[in-house]
Regions:
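Basic nucleic-acid-binding interfaces
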Residues: 1-22, 30-66
Length: 66
């Protein structure tokens, strides 16, 4: 069963990512001080996440963990 967008947001925030301005509509942009670039999530918080979004978040969280 796919995870919800809100669960991916919680994973990013617990890893130290912060939401920054720049997303339009249901797009949200997250940055981390130790990681270059941004992670972009699209879709309402209650929607199911696509597999590529889950993979993107999982990879970003692994990059910043010590």
């Amino acid at each position: 069963m796919p995870r919800k967008i809100r669960q991916l947001i919680a994973d990013l925030e617990s890893a130290g990512f912060a939401q920054v301005p720049g997303g339009k509509g249901s797009h949200r942009k997250f940055r981390h001080p130790r990681r270059p670039g941004a992670v972009l999530l699209s879709g309402p918080a209650g929607d199911d996440a696509h597999h590529y979004q889950e993979k993107q978040v999982r990879h970003a969280v692994r990059e910043v963990q010590p």
